Amino acid sequence: MSSSFLSSTAFFLLLCLGFCHVSSSSSDQGTYIVHMAKSQMPSSFDLHSNWYDSSLRSISDSAELLYTYENAIHGFSTRLTQEEADSLMTQPGVISVLPEHRYELHTTRTPLFLGLDEHTADLFPEAGSYSDVVVGVLDTGVWPESKSYSDEGFGPIPSSWKGGCEAGTNFTASLCNRKLIGARFFARGYESTMGPIDESKESRSPRDDDGHGTHTSSTAAGSVVEGASLLGYASGTARGMAPRARVAVYKVCWLGGCFSSDILAAIDKAIADNVNVLSMSLGGGMSDYYRDGVAIGAFAAMERGILVSCSAGNAGPSSSSLSNVAPWITTVGAGTLDRDFPALAILGNGKNFTGVSLFKGEALPDKLLPFIYAGNASNATNGNLCMTGTLIPEKVKGKIVMCDRGINARVQKGDVVKAAGGVGMILANTAANGEELVADAHLLPATTVGEKAGDIIRHYVTTDPNPTASISILGTVVGVKPSPVVAAFSSRGPNSITPNILKPDLIAPGVNILAAWTGAAGPTGLASDSRRVEFNIISGTSMSCPHVSGLAALLKSVHPEWSPAAIRSALMTTAYKTYKDGKPLLDIATGKPSTPFDHGAGHVSPTTATNPGLIYDLTTEDYLGFLCALNYTSPQIRSVSRRNYTCDPSKSYSVADLNYPSFAVNVDGVGAYKYTRTVTSVGGAGTYSVKVTSETTGVKISVEPAVLNFKEANEKKSYTVTFTVDSSKPSGSNSFGSIEWSDGKHVVGSPVAISWT
């Protein structure tokens, strides 16, 4: 996932690929998360932690509690053998014993692109000075010295805040302020599996030695910083989406990954600390919700009124590649900005190709230089990829080298070329990345070109008897069209866990994003990169997620009474799916119009989300009904919800009737498929009429009633959508459409995805 934007650090290379069970260094033990039925604690215990410890002692003399959980789940984590875990499962009050899982990270112009600028206070008057809304970020920590955490102009820390600032290696509590009001770190689960943290390589504290966490938290809620840029690129004023909101960081990711026991502990603390929004740019694979630590923790946060925003993943453009698909999570894909960093690949045959680059340094001589394909400068089978140790110095010295994208980090390829004596690099996309161009702060003159240009350049360099080339770096341009387009790396639907829930929910800027950076690493994150920068430009759904987190904080400041579902609804139903000329958003991976499986409800539009007209709200009871519709057992529901809940055998539960702002219809034969929704007026009195669009004539979409008349604010109205299928299509076929309600002032849109199973 993160390999789609790996330009920064070796950290990403060490992360587990996918949602994987963590293997211990010991063949006997692993970390387990134990869910307990809190209400079943025997009266002989005065504290739940004592009960947990006693239960553990009954099956092991040596096992110790790593964490006890009170908010995210009821239970604890510990190290056990498989036999001990099986034995613990038989103890009274134990609901489940789940193995630790490891997650991966999904990793100035943006506010203007989204319509947020110095006039933001006109749209969000309650957030114009400073806000008491707190954005919690689970990531790699924070670089507190960054200007993005300046508390100038901020009032006192909110009285509702219950969090703290933890000291540790290279970090003191005094580094927090009225902006950065909380900082914690969680490493017990990580260290129990990976061993003690090597403090010569990373700080055992909230300090961010990687950069990812500083980038995401400042994207969500960084203070206004004038004169921001990366090496002169993207210069301007940097600001987070909610620059007057408070920030609390929870460091859960380390060099070896992000572990579910630590993530749950961080969510547990964040709930107790009273954050309002949780931003998590991490994930991995797909798993049933009762086995997914992020989904379980997010459910508890949702119950406390905390919106949870998560990255969709960087495994696109493959279908069904999403992470974080629980319906109580806002799942965010990535799109581009209207800003680019062009750099020309100039060939000796007179042809030029535009790529992208963030290189800053001594330019190449103003002449054509010898040019070689990496595959012809190596004896290794993967020499074309410019991996460490594969290039023959005698063949590349003094030359520009063409490398193919894949396997190792883009910037690492340039480092390999430079180490072998090459003077420049042309990096070519392959079919996996198509025409998507992600800019990097290379260590030598370099440009990245798309697949089509790469094919032409490769043919030239491998067939011309004396190929030559040069590279010209052109700086920053804005106003690029079309924009946005869906990023190729952005993970796609359909949702393989619950196909009747359309995911991702929406997209936000996630390509070439400028935000604050750590002072402990260069912009590439490579050990050979001695440069230090205050801001960096990187890409991934890791970057799009905090955009939505920050926008949710803005909406929370304006509408403090709104639930997480209401805030998500406002963001989704006001998202746009077309450009200003009416043409549909494009998918860079195909060059064709994107679909709801690519962009969800569309691209976020904060200027309209403040007044959506109608919202689709959801309660905890609705989500419990959803779990019943999945045929979850009572213990499985309890693992997710921390409560003893029994589905009503006399009630018919349907995933299709979850009050979600989108429609995913799975067709299994001809017939009628009915979906019910309830909308709440937040725009006052008004009469809304429905408009239905559909790509296919094989499915008739009808809405009853077709008109909703609201007499006052907060009034609720229900409607039923019937999808009548009168023709079959091959399994795997998809068709798309939309359902829109409008009163002439508001347009409340919902995407429709129809899939034949």
From Swiss-Prot:
- Summarize the temperature dependence annotation: Optimum temperature is 80 degrees Celsius. Thermostable.
Cite the Pfam families for this sequence: fn3_6, Inhibitor_I9, PA, Peptidase_S8
Spell out the residue ranges making up region: Disordered: 196-219
Record comment: activity regulation: Activated by calcium. Inhibited by the serine protease inhibitors 4-(2-aminoethyl)benzenesulphonyl fluoride (AEBSF), PMSF, di-isopropyl phosphofluoridate (DFP) and soybean trypsin inhibitor (SBTI). Not inhibited by benzamidine or iodoacetamide. Leupeptin and pepstatin A have a minor inhibitory action.
Q: Name one GO biological process term.
A: mucilage metabolic process involved in seed coat development
E.C. number: 3.4.21.-
What molecular function terms (GO) are annotated for this protein? serine-type endopeptidase activity
What's in the GO CC field? apoplast; extracellular region; secretory vesicle
- Residue ranges annotated as coiled coil are none
Expressed, tissue-wise, as follows:
Expressed in immature siliques and at lower levels in stems and flowers. Widely expressed at low levels.
Which effects follow disruption of this gene?
A: No visible phenotype under normal growth conditions, but mutant seeds are defective in mucilage extrusion.
Induction statement? By methyl jasmonate.
Where are the annotated glycans? 170, 352, 376, 379, 631, 644
Maturation-removed propeptide residues? 25-106
Composition bias of kind Basic and acidic residues appears in 198-213
Q: Which InterPro entries match?
A: PA_domain, Peptidase_S8/S53_dom, Peptidase_S8/S53_dom_sf, Peptidase_S8_Ser-AS, Peptidase_S8_subtilisin-rel, Peptidases_S8_3, S8pro/Inhibitor_I9, S8pro/Inhibitor_I9_sf
**Where is this gene product found?**
Secreted, Cell wall
Give every Peptidase S8 domain span. 102-610
PROSITE patterns for the chain: SUBTILASE, SUBTILASE_SER
Q: Where is the active site?
A: 139 (charge relay system), 212 (charge relay system), 542 (charge relay system)
Signal peptide bounds? 1-24
Role: Serine protease. Has a substrate preference for the hydrophobic residues Phe and Ala and the basic residue Asp in the P1 position, and for Asp, Leu or Ala in the P1' position. Essential for mucilage release from seed coats. Triggers the accumulation and/or activation of cell wall modifying enzymes necessary either for the loosening of the outer primary cell wall, or to facilitate swelling of the mucilage.
Of which family is this protein a member? Belongs to the peptidase S8 family.
Name the chain's protein. Answer: Subtilisin-like protease SBT1.7
Traced from the root, the source organism's taxonomic lineage reads: Eukaryota, Viridiplantae, Streptophyta, Embryophyta, Tracheophyta
